[in-house]
Design a protein with these regions (language model features):
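Conserved, mostly hydrophobic/aromatic
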Residues: 62, 136, 213, 331, ...
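Feature activates predominantly on carbohydrate-active enzymes
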Residues: 57, 61, 105-307, 324-325, ...
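Catalytic-core regions of glycoside hydrolase
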Residues: 70, 75-79, 97, 176, ...
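C-terminal non-catalytic alpha-helical accessory regions
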Residues: 470-474, 484-712, 716
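Aromatic-lined, polymer-binding surfaces characteristic
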Residues: 285-309, 322-330, 334-337, 344-348, ...
Length: 734
């Protein structure tokens, strides 16, 4: 049986290489011919910046797909007799618009909630009207964006009557922000963090970023930094703590700025976010005093330093006084409380004294303003939270690492019930922290996975929202492409498909696959995108399947793209060899139905999907993805060429893990039984794994700069195949 598996693995690798070689030679994916379409007039509420943004984006899209001219006009300019083709973007409070819609035969608009919208079409006397009516300014903006997507995916004539409302109320980005060498985020050491110090102080970056995430249906931007207060506020009595200028990770001055100019900068960012319907939150960890250690006040990270408590409490109050557009603050009762880290009662009292009282101080001055507060549910116990923080007049939510650090593992992770739902009150809302410390490089795209993840969020009012992001990566501008633009491409644009899925499907998990295929077709100028959609989905199932088979929960322990771990646990530092794969600590993901490698080898578990069956599934997914993209010709389309390369990279990684899983199982069985045929099989499989790894390296190297420094994982050199070679040596030694 094992010999058949070896032959099967070799055949898959050989077939994959042939398909890849032929992929760019095929001409099925030629660009679709441009179509000349009718003129369109877009009427919009020009008093609302986010609606104006939507109208201008729609103008760009309609022009791109061939409508000419596309003219923008204010609602007040709408004539009694309509043009041949027109669009209306407005709020449902505009009674003249609603009356005109009904006069022209449009379906009546009912009551609409926050961010909800309806699409309506009218066709009286051959005059085609397309209407986006929002329950508020943001809903109207989303309606206009939706019409643009429909037009891009096919034709504006595909717009149909429909009512839309957000499935998840708050859909956010988790942005670990490298403010300054003196003001670090959780981990700015990687290439992505280091390269983005300059960008986060560029207003044009934030405008492009906020425009992009608004179109992707995100309405929350959470900015995470260990101790941002010296940058953000000047606190009475502690004025000298405020920091001027900006320094990068190496201590190089990158921008001369007074503190007042910094405040003005962040006020502009928050104003712009508000104009795109996006809330801004700041998140902090405790206890940190970065940037303020050397002042005259004696500020330290000691839990018993009363001056530190006073400074941070007053910083919280000043934060809301300084930024009227700031929605809220999130905080973590860790991970730096020294000998008090496990004293939850002490920590929660400290956090209440600082953050709770700081907010109450502000509310005394401005009782009408609602202040959001999120208490991260990490290194604590709700027993010590509820009675304290329930005193906040505007309430508070919890936050929880929904999949630990493995967003790409299972869409229905099993942890939340026992960790949160069973130990907190029925009415307690929680934000789900969707931690992606799995995929930093390759473009991912599985709509069904995202849909099921969203539908599996707890109901009964327990979901406040979600934030999507990483601890070990900065999702600002990309820093690894061999084809860089100037300025460098946004990560949200490079990974536009996955960001769109996590945003748009959070708003509407029933988003049509046909619409998504149409958007792929438009993005990459394809005649048909069905093959790309299916192949991308197949390739994107590989990493989650690997993570379910070998579930290693935290970012520092395991990075699947590099097959490595680092930092806290020396036993799993560096490349993860077959010996580490056999470590009984890392079995199949709970409730996944998969038998982990150690349990399969030992015989502890016999019911479920075996590792060898997983290996077969990985090869099948790889073969399906390669076959699907074999007829797509990228031509000179760099984005499509890199996307196809990322699909092939995931394929090669899947083939690598398929062979490695087989080799690990065979080695484990050899050690258990002493049968030499298992050892021979292990060596053969691991040689196949080495071949697959080298193919993986070639795919990555076609698009990316090698030797990236990945936070928590050190330098990733994909041409360094000493790890896969070590696996072979381990098997040879037995």
């Amino acid at each position: 049986m094992m010999n058949r598996l070896i032959k099967s693995s070799l055949l898959v690798l050989m077939a994959g290489a042939t398909l890849a070689a032929n992929a760019l030679a095929a001409g099925v994916g030629a660009p679709a011919p441009k179509v000349s379409r009718e003129a369109v007039v877009v009427y919009y509420d020009n008093a609302e910046p986010c609606i104006e943004f939507s109208a201008r984006e729609l103008q760009k899209t309609l022009t791109t797909v061939g409508h000419k001219p596309v003219t923008l006009k204010a609602l007040a300019e709408m004539p009694a007799s309509p043009e041949a083709c027109y669009v209306v973007i407005a709020k449902n409070t505009s009674q003249p618009v609603l009356r005109l819609l009904e006069t022209r035969g449009g379906q009546k608009v009912g009551a609409l909630g926050k961010e909800a919208y309806v699409l309506r079409r009218t066709d009286g006397g051959g005059k085609k009207g397309y209407w986006a009516i929002g329950g508020d300014r943001v809903g109207a903006m989303y309606g206009g964006v939706d019409i643009g997507e429909i037009a891009a995916a096919g034709s504006i004539a595909d717009v149909v009557n429909g009512d839309h409302k957000p499935y998840v109320a708050k859909r956010g980005m988790k942005f670990n922000i490298p403010l300054d060498k003196r003001q670090p985020s959780f981990d700015d050491n990687g290439t992505s963090g280091r390269e983005n110090f300059q960008h986060v102080w560029d207003l044009e970056f934030w405008k492009e970023y906020l425009d992009t995430i608004a179109k992707q249906r995100y309405n929350v931007l959470s900015l995470w930094n260990r101790h941002p207060f010296p940058t953000l506020v000047k606190v009475p009595g502690y004025e000298d703590v405020a920091l001027d200028d900006v320094y990068d990770k190496d201590g190089k001055l990158i921008k001369k700025m007074t503190h007042a100019e910094k405040v003005a900068f962040w006020q502009k960012v928050m104003d712009y976010a508000d104009d795109r319907g996006i809330e801004v939150w700041w998140y902090v960890w405790n206890i940190h005093v970065y940037g303020s250690e050397d002042t005259k006040h004696g500020l330290t990270d000691s839990p018993t330093n009363a001056t530190t408590k006073d400074y941070i409490r007053k910083s919280v109050t000043q934060l809301f006084l300084t930024y009227p557009k700031l929605t809220g603050l999130g905080m973590c009762p860790g991970e730096n409380f020294a000998d008090k880290n496990k004293d939850h009662d002490f920590k929660e009292q400290w956090c209440w004294d600082v953050y709770g009282e700081g907010i109450l101080d502000y509310k005394k001055l401005n009782p009408a303003r609602k202040i959001g507060f999120v208490h991260r549910y990490w290194l604590t116990d709700f027993t010590y939270i509820g009675d304290r923080f329930k005193k906040l007049p505007d309430g508070y939510d919890l936050e929880y690492k929904y999949s630990k650090a493995r967003l790409y593992s299972a869409p229905n992770p099993p942890f939340v019930k026992k960790d949160v739902l069973d130990v907190t009150p029925a009415g307690m809302k929680t934000w789900w922290n969707l931690r992606n410390d799995d995929i930093f490089l390759v473009r991912w795209g599985d709509p069904e996975y995202v849909k099921q993840a969203v539908l599996n969020f707890p109901g009964d009012g327990r979901t406040a929202g979600y934030v999507w992001g990483s601890d070990r990566f900065c999702w600002g501008r990309e820093s690894a492409s061999k084809n860089p633009t100037s300025p460098r491409q946004l990560e949200n644009d490079k990974h536009w498909y996955s960001f769109l899925l996590w945003g748009r499907l959070g708003y509407d998990p029933e988003t049509s696959p046909q619409l998504l295929k149409g958007l792929l077709k438009h993005r990459f100028h394809l005649a048909d995108a069905g093959a790309l959609y299916d192949s991308w989905q197949s390739a994107s199932q590989i990493i989650p399947l690997v993570n379910r088979t070998r579930y290693v929960p935290w970012d520092f322990m395991w990075w699947v793209e590099g097959c490595r771990g680092n930092l806290l646990d020396k036993s799993i530092q560096g490349f993860h060899t077959v010996n580490i794969f056999l470590d009984e600590r890392w079995g199949g993901m709970e409730n996944s139905g998969i038998i982990g490698i150690p349990d399969y080898v030992s015989g502890k578990k016999t019911s479920g999907t075996t590792p060898l069956q997983v290996a077969t599934q990985l090869d099948e997914l790889a073969e399906k993805a390669l076959k699907g993209i074999s007829g797509i010709n990228a031509g000179d389309n760099v984005g499509l060429r890199e996307t196809l390369g990322d699909i092939r990279a995931q394929v090669r990684l899947g083939q690598y893990y398929a062979a490695k899983i087989r080799g690990t199982v065979a080695l484990g069985l050899f050690r258990k039984t002493g049968k030499t045929e298992y050892q021979k099989d292990a060596i053969a499989h691991l040689k196949n794994a080495l071949t697959a790894w080298r193919n993986y390296a070639k795919e990555l190297d076609a698009s990316y700069t090698n030797k990236l420094f990945i936070s928590g994982q050190k330098t990733f050199d994909w041409f360094d195949d000493s790890g896969p070679q070590l696996d072979i040596a381990i098997a040879e030694q037995g």
